[in-house]
From Swiss-Prot:
<protein>
    <recommendedName>
        <fullName>Histidinol-phosphate aminotransferase</fullName>
        <ecNumber>2.6.1.9</ecNumber>
    </recommendedName>
</protein>
<dbReference type="InterPro" id="IPR001917">
    <property type="entry name" value="Aminotrans_II_pyridoxalP_BS"/>
</dbReference>
<dbReference type="InterPro" id="IPR015424">
    <property type="entry name" value="PyrdxlP-dep_Trfase"/>
</dbReference>
<keyword id="KW-0028">Amino-acid biosynthesis</keyword>
<keyword id="KW-0663">Pyridoxal phosphate</keyword>
<dbReference type="GO" id="GO:0000105">
    <property type="term" value="P:L-histidine biosynthetic process"/>
</dbReference>
<dbReference type="GO" id="GO:0004400">
    <property type="term" value="F:histidinol-phosphate transaminase activity"/>
</dbReference>
<dbReference type="InterPro" id="IPR004839">
    <property type="entry name" value="Aminotransferase_I/II_large"/>
</dbReference>
<comment type="pathway">
    <text>Amino-acid biosynthesis; L-histidine biosynthesis; L-histidine from 5-phospho-alpha-D-ribose 1-diphosphate: step 7/9.</text>
</comment>
<comment type="subunit">
    <text>Homodimer.</text>
</comment>
<dbReference type="GO" id="GO:0030170">
    <property type="term" value="F:pyridoxal phosphate binding"/>
</dbReference>
<keyword id="KW-0032">Aminotransferase</keyword>
<dbReference type="Pfam" id="PF00155">
    <property type="entry name" value="Aminotran_1_2"/>
</dbReference>
<comment type="similarity">
    <text>Belongs to the class-II pyridoxal-phosphate-dependent aminotransferase family. Histidinol-phosphate aminotransferase subfamily.</text>
</comment>
<dbReference type="InterPro" id="IPR005861">
    <property type="entry name" value="HisP_aminotrans"/>
</dbReference>
<keyword id="KW-0368">Histidine biosynthesis</keyword>
<keyword id="KW-0808">Transferase</keyword>
Amino acid sequence: MSTVTITDLARENVRNLTPYQSARRLGGNGDVWLNANEYPTAVEFQLTQQTLNRYPECQPKAVIENYAQYAGVKPEQVLVSRGADEGIELLIRAFCEPGKDAILYCPPTYGMYSVSAETIGVECRTVPTLENWQLDLQGISDKLDGVKVVYVCSPNNPTGQLINPQDFRTLLELTRGKAIVVADEAYIEFCPQASLVGWLAEYPHLAILRTLSKAFALAGLRCGFTLANEEVINLLMKVIAPYPLSTPVADIAAQALSPQGIVAMRERVAQIIAEREYLIAALKEIPCVEQVFDSETNYILARFKASSAVFKSLWDQGIILRDQNKQPSLSGCLRITVGTREESQRVIDALRAEQV
């Protein structure tokens, strides 16, 4: 008699799944953490809601209203979730039939689009970006049949550049009546003029992902948003968990999105942008650095001579960067989160000491 293991009982696609390799999963024993695009220092909040004996609201009113005001949309166009990652998954669950429909994304880009689709049993199609990391619109057009959701990260993680707005328009026209286009704007606070939020009225099939993890310095809170037209939001509400945000999370999120919270966020953004330019200028003068790419975000992508050796050398010194070598077209590339001036100096000094 054959013995069936617990693993044998699991769905085949789950058995074959490679989980997303988050910065925390990859580990390390560093004291300079520049691998997860987090804000470098903690922001203090006081909990004001003490009614923890009661279940929270499904969509906390103060959070929704504050975010709607900040983003310039109606409250009915906002969904709050456990990070933007949950929004990625909700869109697939709401719009894609497992075994029938597909999602499409354009590597090199964020890894959770594929993980979410594969977990649910939805096909992933990829159309690599062009040499300048812009969209291959012809390639996308050729692969759209059967695609229900298209993910485009702008500014793109890990490359740091914005997608050409005219290409976004072309994509939205190509997909009208066929698929949802998701603009992942996790880093939009670092270049707010590039947001597509003003396009929602024109494109009923546009959805926008946002987060409090980056510029709002709340990666540990796990709070993100989907902005879309009311018809899309209503569908997402059918598949979201009944209580996605705990009471303390909603409490802190509402404070972060208050007028004074927004002012503080914008001050942090200005500080990070200044630090980014300092770090870019320094990296360009370092012998082991072959190329530094322009960035509209809180991280910098650079190509290194002997990048694996450089990555390990810094790792051994407690400086944890993100290796991008396995991403399409990113051979030799490492991604560096913009931290404090002290952290930037640690990186600069360590790289200058590398023998090339």
